[in-house]
């Protein structure tokens, strides 16, 4: 019996390896499929995140009205909220973005003046006299950069066009994908557990529920935390007299999605803009960010997300380093929820195995009694 099982699984593994080998030799056959999957990856990812945010609301409304009508009602409320925000905040954002771009030449001049002052300092002179610093290499790098600047700008414009195209595709496709996820997503666990033996299906549904609750708690909690951080920083920047407070608050809210690293990324523009105005404002910007992050880390995050993820900070930092090296910013954003899901899955599997072992021991102990 054991030999037959080993023989069976050996053949299965060899068959899979053979398929992978053949696929690498005829990769052009799979190219259209790969392009199709890569095109739909971001819309599916965003729709999946929104599904875990909105699905609890749909389930709540479903108690009073049909599920499809609940989804349409959420869509209408969401569109109305976006329209209200665009009408009330849109002009302010436009004015601040325009002002920021108009002031960029002045900021560049200030940076150049600061660099010139530093070049005459004793520290800079000492640095230039070190053996590991080569003025000729620095000049060559600057010359090469300036010579390639037109080509870099052209390639950047092409990249911007590609980004705009992808964003347009996401905006068009995500609402449709999300609608059908919200409409039929609750049926998926019941369909998936049908591949399991009947005695395991109840436990399988519990595992699906635990994974869903973990993701929902994380994404909903992150949404609330980002809104709090962005709003609090905006108010703090206003009190500190920082220019472009709204834009800088939005940047802080967006970058806060990345644990630990995000606040530093979001604070950098505020500190730079504040420093261009006065060093005191840069210091105030740092104080605002520190206070908001203390409130977030010690009060809000434990209340909103709680002990749900139960992950040590060192583990998260290591995850961010590894995920950032492989997947960049996207990898850092997805590292924690993916780890939480994998961890919850394996913990449930271990729990299931222990339950089965205990039930077998109890069954074997019955005849002895």
From Swiss-Prot:
This protein's record includes keyword Hydrolase: no
Per the record, membrane topology reads: Multi-pass membrane protein
From which lineage does this chain's organism come? Bacteria, Bacillati, Bacillota, Bacilli, Bacillales
Which keywords are on file for this protein? Cell membrane, Membrane, Transmembrane, Transmembrane helix, Transport
Q: Name one Pfam family in it.
A: AI-2E_transport
* Name of protein: Putative transport protein YueF
Task: Fetch the InterPro entries from UniProt.
Answer: AI-2E-like
Q: Which GO terms describe its cellular component?
A: plasma membrane
Keyword check for Methyltransferase: no
Q: Major location, coarse class? A: membrane
Q: Which GO terms describe its biological process?
A: transmembrane transport
Would you identify the family this protein belongs to, as annotated?
Answer: Belongs to the autoinducer-2 exporter (AI-2E) (TC 2.A.86) family.
Where is it located?
Cell membrane
Classify the source by domain of life. Bacteria
What residue range is the signal peptide?
Answer: none
